[in-house]
Structure formats: structure tokens, C-alpha cells
Design a protein with these regions (language model features):
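Bacterial N-terminal signal peptides
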Residues: 10-19
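Sec/Tat signal peptide C-region and signal peptidase I cleavage site
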Residues: 20-25
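Active-site-proximal beta-strand/loop segments in catalytic clefts of secreted hydrolases
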Residues: 88-91, 130-134, 179-180, 208-212, ...
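Surface cap/lid and interfacial helix-loop subdomains adjacent to catalytic sites
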Residues: 151-170, 191-353, 357, 389
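Gly/Ala-rich beta-loop-alpha elbow adjacent to hydrolase catalytic centers
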Residues: 178-182, 186
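Bacterial N-terminal signal peptides that target proteins for export
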Residues: 1-10
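N-terminal module-boundary/linker segments of secreted carbohydrate-active enzymes
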Residues: 26-71
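Active-site catalytic motif of lipid deacylating hydrolases and related acyltransferases
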Residues: 42, 48-51, 77-81, 87-173, ...
């Protein structure tokens, strides 16, 4: 199947509800589902006890200024953070079966977890389980079948979270971090384990990007969750941050059905929290990936600065280039990203993050691939403030 065709089907599967914990039928109905042993450190991508911790690698960045000059931004993890972060990665596996195995691929789970989550180690202990997610090929094989599944992706995430609680939490506050399929699984986890239950008192926040958290119009709770509210400020603890990103010049709407930001009915709306400025427009503190290993359908790495080629750090910052605001057009509620390009200076005038089909931007996806990295610095700062608010309440 051509890349353009599987991306089309992938999008249709998302629209049909794929990212929810309900997944696809697997031809193993007569077999008992064997539980993953989360006492085995090899079943964690990120874990304080894992010597091969994916989140333990260097996440230093090169700052590319508006004049094209560059400077190094070093990074260190907090050796004794007061809270924990539990992360569930998005749909990324290219394993050929419907469900991913427990052997993470470098170009899929490993790089995704590294780019989306490792930087949080500056504010929290990092836990990221390997789980048997629905794979990208699995979406294609089962795009028309959303019933009679064994929900192993959700079962794995719930078991990993409960293992963390029983063996590592010790009453500490925690942040849940997810994207896309990971977000949908965390939505189910919050509903089943946290919302309105004693464990809610330990929730510092939940960052649920790249999928829909729904509330009644004008409300902060009562849709996806009965009691866990949406965040209304950067320093608020015990709440949910959620958003999906689109370019300002390619907004959702018009022809075609866009994948993110649309509420299920006219009485509700999808959450949009702007990490750059919850009250309006603000500058995105992006940590853009400078890792050259990409799959087809993603634009090549830009030349960050023609005046300083050869940047080698895993991340690049472009201060002043990117800003964002939440837009609600009555149908879609989304995070609009603007680029302050200046063709006269040597710095890049664009970023990569769109899904490409046959070399053209596939508009319904928006900037889904970089939802997290676009606001990474903002999110880490917010978690730091939320941790302080949590400790002081």
C-alpha cells in the first residue's frame, strides 16, 4: 500500500474513534491475554532504575537567534525532584502486527519518547512504560473494525500505572503526560482510576495533547471528566492541559474533515489551553528536533541558520519565531501557531512538523507530529509552577 493511502486510512481510523482505549479485534479470542511484567525494568523506556533510560540522554539545545547566530543551551536533570511524571507515547510503532511487541524500535518508540518526554526530567522523576499499542500497520489492517477487541493497550497502561503507584509513588504528586493514542489511554485511565476518587488529590496535572478533551460549552468539567477540571492558569494544580495545533495559514475547516479540535455536538467544545499564554497570545518556547532520522511523509530538516551550518545538538530553539493562541471558530477549538519569518535574515523561515502526502501538506493533520515539542519549554515551566502550587496547597 502506498504511503498516501495508509495515511488516509490512518486519518479515517482516528476520526472513527481509534485513539480511544477501544481498539481493534485481534485473532486471539481463544487465548488468554498475558499480562506484561512491569517489575521487569526492560519494559520501561524511562524509569529511575533503568540504566538504559531513554530519558537519561543529553537533551541540550542550540539556540538559533534571529540574526542567525547560535549559542549552546546546556541541560541537567533535577537530581531530587518533588514529583513524578508518567508518560504514554503516541501511535508510532511500525511493527507489522495489529499490536506492538515489547521491543521498542529506535525510530519509533525510542526517539518519540526522547523528543516528547526526556526534558521533563528537569522537574520530575520520569516513568514511561513500553505498552502493546495499536500499530500504524494495525490501523490499516483493521480500519473498519473497532469492536470486539481485547484492549491490551489500555490494560498495559493501567497495569504499568498501578505498578508505579504500588512500588514507586509513596504518596508523591504526579503528572500524566500523553499524546494522541497516549492521550486517549490516559483519558480512560483518569476516568477509571482518578476522577472523583482519592487519587485525584495526588494529581499535579495532566498534559493531554493531540487528542480531544471535551467539556460542556463554557464549563471546565463535566464532559470527558466529571470532577477533574481544565486548567485556567499556568500555576493551577490538579487540572488538565489539552490542545491540538494548526498553522495560522492552514486552519481547520472548509473542505474535508479535520482530525482535531472538533466537538462531538453543538452543546460541547474541545479544550484548548495555550501553554505559551493561557490568557491570550504568547511566544512558544519550542524545542524542535534536530534528529535527522525521519520517515517518509515528513519534510526534510531545515537549514536552521545559513550563517552557522552543522548544528549537532539533538534540539534547536528559535526564540521569537513561533507564537500561539487558542482559536474557537464555533466548530473547531485549536491552538493556532504563527511563524514570524524574515527572509532577510539567515535563520530558517519555517519548521517541519506537517504530515506530507505525495509531497503536499495534508491539512487535516495540522502540526500533530510536533504538538509536544512546539511548546516543550512552556510545558516544563508550567509543570514547575504546578509542582510548587501542589506542594503549597
Amino acid at each position: 500500500m502506498r504511503y498516501s493511502e495508509w495515511m488516509r486510512i490512518f486519518g479515517l481510523a482516528l476520526l472513527a474513534g481509534l485513539p480511544l482505549a477501544s481498539a481493534f479485534a485481534q485473532e486471539v479470542e481463544s487465548e488468554a491475554l498475558e499480562a506484561v511484567d512491569y517489575g521487569d525494568i526492560d519494559n520501561w523506556l524511562c524509569h529511575p532504575g533503568n540504566t538504559l533510560d531513554v530519558c537519561g540522554h543529553d537533551v541540550s539545545a542550540t539556540i538559533v537567534n534571529a540574526d542567525g547566530s547560535v549559542e549552546l543551551e546546556a541541560w541537567t536533570a533535577d537530581p531530587d525532584p518533588g514529583i513524578d511524571c508518567f508518560y504514554v507515547y503516541p501511535t508510532t510503532s511500525l511493527d507489522e502486527d495489529t499490536w506492538a511487541d515489547l521491543h521498542p524500535g529506535r525510530h519509533e518508540e525510542v526517539i518519540t519518547a526522547f523528543t516528547q518526554f526526556a526534558r521533563f526530567k528537569s522537574v520530575c522523576r520520569a516513568f514511561a512504560p513500553v505498552y502493546r499499542q495499536i500499530t500504524i500497520p494495525g490501523l490499516l489492517m483493521n480500519a473498519g473494525n473497532l469492536a470486539n477487541n481485547d484492549q491490551r493497550n489500555y490494560i498495559d497502561v493501567a497495569n504499568a500505572f498501578n505498578h508505579y503507584l504500588e512500588n514507586h509513588n509513596d504518596g508523591r504528586g504526579f503528572v500524566l503526560v500523553g499524546h494522541s493514542q497516549g492521550t486517549s489511554l490516559l483519558i480512560e485511565l483518569i476516568r477509571n482510576e482518578i476522577d472523583g476518587r482519592p487519587l485525584q488529590d495526588q494529581l499535579v496535572s495532566a498534559i493531554l495533547a493531540g487528542n480531544s478533551v471535551v467539556v460542556p460549552k463554557g464549563e471546565v468539567a463535566g464532559g470527558s471528566f466529571s470532577e477533574v477540571p481544565l486548567c485556567e492558569s499556568a500555576g493551577q494544580a490538579g487540572c488538565v492541559i489539552s490542545y491540538a495545533t494548526y498553522r495560522d495559514n492552514i486552519p481547520p475547516g472548509g473542505e474535508g474533515l479535520f482530525l482535531f479540535g472538533r466537538a462531538p455536538n453543538e452543546d460541547s467544545e474541545v479544550a484548548c489551553f495555550n501553554p505559551a499564554n493561557p490568557g491570550g497570545e504568547g511566544e512558544l518556547d519550542a524545542y524542535l528536533s534536530n534528529i535527522g532520522e525521519i520517515f517518509q511523509g515528513v519534510a526534510p530538516m531545515p537549514v536552521w541558520s545559513s550563517a552557522a551550518p552543522g548544528i549537532s545538538t539533538p534540539f534547536v530553539k528559535v526564540p521569537g519565531l513561533l507564537s500561539a493562541r487558542c482559536v474557537n471558530d464555533g466548530t473547531y477549538h485549536y491552538l493556532e501557531v504563527s511563524i514570524a519569518a524574515d527572509p532577510a535574515d539567515p535563520r530558517t523561515d519555517d519548521i517541519r512538523g506537517d504530515v506530507l502526502i505525495d509531497g503536499q501538506i495534508n491539512a487535516p493533520w495540522g502540526l500533530h507530529l510536533i504538538d509536544m515539542t512546539l511548546a516543550m519549554g512552556n510545558l516544563v515551566d508550567i509543570v514547575r509552577m504546578q509542582a510548587e502550587a501542589y506542594a503549597g496547597r
